A protein has these predicted regions:
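N-terminal, polar/charged subdomain of small-to-medium soluble alpha/beta proteins
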Residues: 1-103
C-alpha cells in the first residue's frame, strides 16, 4: 500500500511521518488488498494562532470502487491522524455491504 503525505502550512517531522505510516498500515491492514493507495493531507488551518486547527485529510483509493475521504480536525496532528485512521477503518469495514459486485 502506497502512502503519500502532503502538507500545507505544517511541518512534517520524521517522527510524525513514521507515526502516520505505522498508524495507517495498522488500521488499514485488514483491507490492504483492496487499497491502491492513500493520500494524507496535513494542514494547519489557523497557522501560528493555535487552537483546534490541525487537519488530517485521508483519501483512500480503492480497487474498483470509488475513493473514500475522511477528515478530522484536532489540536494535534497525531490525534487527528489517529481519529482519521479509525474512521477510515470503520468506513472500509462497512463498505462491502453497500458496494455492488464488480466483474
Amino acid at each position: 500500500m502506497k502512502i503519500a503525505i502532503q502538507t500545507r502550512d505544517a511541518e512534517l517531522t520524521d517522527d510524525l511521518r513514521e507515526h502516520l505510516e505505522q498508524r495507517l498500515a495498522f488500521a488499514l491492514s485488514r483491507c490492504q488488498n483492496r487499497i491502491r493507495g492513500v493520500v494524507v493531507g496535513l494542514s494547519d488551518i489557523n497557522g501560528s494562532k493555535g487552537g483546534i486547527d490541525k487537519r488530517c485529510h485521508l483519501r483512500i483509493r480503492l480497487n474498483g470502487l470509488s475513493d473514500i475521504a475522511v477528515e478530522e480536525t484536532e489540536a494535534d496532528f497525531d490525534v487527528a491522524a489517529n481519529h482519521a485512521a479509525d474512521r477510515a477503518k470503520r468506513t472500509l469495514a462497512r463498505r462491502p455491504r453497500y458496494a455492488r459486485d464488480i466483474p
